[in-house]
Amino acid sequence: MKVLLVNGSPHKAGCTHEALQYVGNELVAEGIGVDEFWIGAKPIGGCMGCYKCAERGECVMSGDKVEEFLAIADEYDGYVFGSPVHYAGITGNMKAFMDRAFFSNQGRVTFAQKPAAVVTSARRAGTTAALEQLEKHIQYSQMFQVGSRYWNMVHGAAADEVAKDEEGVQIMQTLGRNMAYILKCIEAGRAAGVPLPAPIENRVATNFIR
């Protein structure tokens, strides 16, 4: 089993990376493989709403971190998406990354029925609002959202300050253990012949105005 930690910060080794490492260390201790994917600091174009992905099965915008991520995403059994807080929300690059990665993937089963978690980091405030943004992609995509003993956030203005947020560190550690447990439960269920929930046939999309 493997989990992919997605670092949505423009700083490769900043506070978000530190938070993800605490999660990852617990996963490794439980025998779960871990890799980290950094979305980078180069601009990522946002979704244009062209719906070409519905025809092509992939986003028309290519050659960036979204394409690179989707090329490997199928290999993983779970995901942790992290972002720093910019103006009480996730970074602009992370928003563009998440929107395109998830929306262009709707016709495939990369994410459905896999566990996922989200984490945020900030100097002071805005973490809960940013968490809610990330959670939307998880909840929409039929994933099993993993929680901890508090909202999944750490605080610090620099990477070395995250360790001083002792409660935040424990929240990340608990999250890692919970993620490992869910992964093992899914594996045990599969081995015991317990199937994952069957999809609803003939999915309906109802517009509010028609």
Name each region found by the language model.
Residues N7-G8, K12-H17, G45-A54, D77:
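Cysteine-centered iron-sulfur cluster-binding motifs in ferredoxin-type domains/subunits
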Residues F144-R210:
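Glycine-rich phosphate/pyrophosphate-binding loop and the adjoining helix
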Residues K2-E30:
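N-terminal beta1-alpha1 ligand-phosphate binding loop
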Residues I32-K42:
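A short beta-strand-loop structural module common to alpha/beta enzyme folds
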